[in-house]
């Protein structure tokens, strides 16, 4: 393996260690009470290393959203299929519920990012379904079903997170709803 790829791998590992330290601190502290020094002390890495990867805590937070969801949605879609991918995502959100409860309260931009991630997953649902069916979806139909359902699922999962309810319990309802809507479009 080349030095470039080794450094890149080391970089991602370091970012994940920093992100985990931040998430751990969020379990017992308010977002605004956590300093970069606190994060790096928890990570057991020198403070300056934080700034090699992130300008500030907001950038770290954005990286966490993008990285965690991308790993769950993009990295697993071909291997697991959309239904298992959905289940993995709901379980992940359940396991990290306190973190996301706090984030929803302090960061209104996260809701938009959360919506985009649901749209990405639903794009894959339609793509997967289109491969299994003779029906060819128009761009308008794809856009409608993805955006409509993403908004609904985003709102329901956000509310469940804030209330502390299990998201895994929503799994069969979400799957059944999506399959029923797909069947309507395909008929």
Swiss-Prot record:
Source organism per UniProt: Lactococcus lactis subsp. lactis (strain IL1403) (Streptococcus lactis)
Molecular function as annotated in GO: DNA binding
Gene from which this protein is expressed: dhaS
Organism taxonomic ancestry: Bacteria, Bacillati, Bacillota, Bacilli, Lactobacillales
Stretches assigned to the HTH tetR-type domain: 12-72
Subunit structure, interactors included: Homodimer. Interacts with a homodimer of DhaQ.
NCBIfam families per record: DHAK_reg
DNA-binding stretch(es), residue numbering of this chain: 35-54
Keywords: Activator, DNA-binding, Transcription, Transcription regulation
Name of the featured protein: HTH-type dhaKLM operon transcriptional activator DhaS
Domain of life of the native organism: Bacteria
Record flagged with keyword Transcription: yes
Task of the protein: In complex with DhaQ, upon activation by dihydroxyacetone, activates transcription of the dhaKLM operon. Binds the inverted repeat sequence 5'-GGACACATN(6)ATTTGTCC-3' located upstream of and partially overlapping with the -35 promoter sequence of the dhaKLM operon promoter.
């Amino acid at each position: 393996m080349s030095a470039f790829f080794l450094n890149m791998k080391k970089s991602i590992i370091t970012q994940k260690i920093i992100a985990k330290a931040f998430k751990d601190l969020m379990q017992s502290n308010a977002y605004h009470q956590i300093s970069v020094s606190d994060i790096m002390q928890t990570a057991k890495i020198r403070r300056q290393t934080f700034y090699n990867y992130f300008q500030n805590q907001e950038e770290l937070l954005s990286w966490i959203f993008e990285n965690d969801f991308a790993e769950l949605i993009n990295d697993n879609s071909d291997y697991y299929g959309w239904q298992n991918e959905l289940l993995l995502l709901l379980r992940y959100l359940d396991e990290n519920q306190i973190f996301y409860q706090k984030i929803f309260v302090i960061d209104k931009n996260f809701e938009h990012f959360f919506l985009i991630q649901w749209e990405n997953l639903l794009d894959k649902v339609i793509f997967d379904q289109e491969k299994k069916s003779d029906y060819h979806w128009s761009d308008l139909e794809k856009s409608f079903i993805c955006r409509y359902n993403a908004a609904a699922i985003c709102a329901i999962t956000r509310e469940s997170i804030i209330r502390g309810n299990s998201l895994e319990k929503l799994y069969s309802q979400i799957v059944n709803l999506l399959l029923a809507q797909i069947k309507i479009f395909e008929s």
